[in-house]
């Protein structure tokens, strides 16, 4: 295991897309090596939010987080955002040096915006760079629109399954598009 080169994959579920008004309701992480083999799966943590905050979610988030069961789990959780941040950092420090890993995932800049607002210590744990799988997807759509290179996934909109999908998606693009 190389704590200098391992990659941290992260996904957040939020009440919406605007970090100034919406909040994190779930966080999960997975650590892989550079060949994208999973080394360790971090805790998948559901963060308590009060009913006032949850009632301000838009229709899309309300429907998806209700159908996945996440909204019920948020109400039942007693975990604070700070506690989730501390538990996530405790896990990550076992596998990756501070500042070594880019933030990996899909549309990861959005997650980083929320981490900056709500989990700043965790946000600073990452390198400033990203490995954003959605960039490759957008390039394939634009450069090879008729090819069967686009990775199809059936997301549950739960943080841990979304990370696993992102890792599989990057493996797919590495094999069929990048040819490394």
UniProtKB/Swiss-Prot annotation:
Keyword Cytoplasm belongs to the record: yes
Gene3D superfamilies linked:
Ribonuclease H-like superfamily/Ribonuclease H
Q: Where in the cell is it found?
A: Cytoplasm
Q: Name one GO cellular component term.
A: cytoplasm
Residues folding into a coiled coil are none
Could you name the domain of life of the organism this protein comes from?
Answer: Bacteria
Pfam families with a match to the protein in the record: RNase_T
Listed GO molecular functions?
3'-5'-RNA exonuclease activity; nucleic acid binding
Instruction: Provide the Exonuclease domain boundaries.
Output: 7-170
Which keywords does this Swiss-Prot/TrEMBL entry list?
Cytoplasm, Exonuclease, Hydrolase, Nuclease
Briefly state the protein's biological role: 3'-to-5' exoribonuclease specific for small oligoribonucleotides.
Any idea what this protein is called? Oligoribonuclease
- Origin organism is Ruthia magnifica subsp. Calyptogena magnifica
């Amino acid at each position: 295991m190389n704590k200098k080169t391992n990659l941290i994959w992260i996904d957040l579920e939020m009440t919406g897309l605007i970090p100034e008004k919406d909040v994190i309701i779930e966080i999960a992480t997975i650590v892989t090596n550079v060949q994208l083999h999973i080394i360790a799966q971090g805790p998948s943590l559901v963060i308590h939010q009060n009913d006032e905050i949850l009632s301000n979610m838009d229709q899309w988030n309300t429907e998806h987080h209700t159908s996945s069961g996440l909204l019920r789990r948020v109400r039942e959780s007693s975990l604070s955002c700070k506690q989730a941040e501390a538990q996530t950092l405790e896990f990550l420090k076992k596998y990756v040096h501070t500042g070594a890993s880019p933030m990996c995932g899909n549309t990861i800049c959005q997650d980083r915006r929320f981490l900056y607002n709500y989990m700043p210590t965790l946000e600073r744990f990452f390198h400033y760079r990203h490995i954003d799988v959605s960039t490759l997807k957008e390039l394939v759509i634009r450069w090879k629109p008729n090819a069967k290179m686009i990775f199809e996934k059936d997301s549950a909109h739960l943080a841990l399954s979304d990370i696993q999908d992102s890792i599989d998606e990057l493996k797919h693009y590495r094999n069929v598009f990048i040819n490394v």
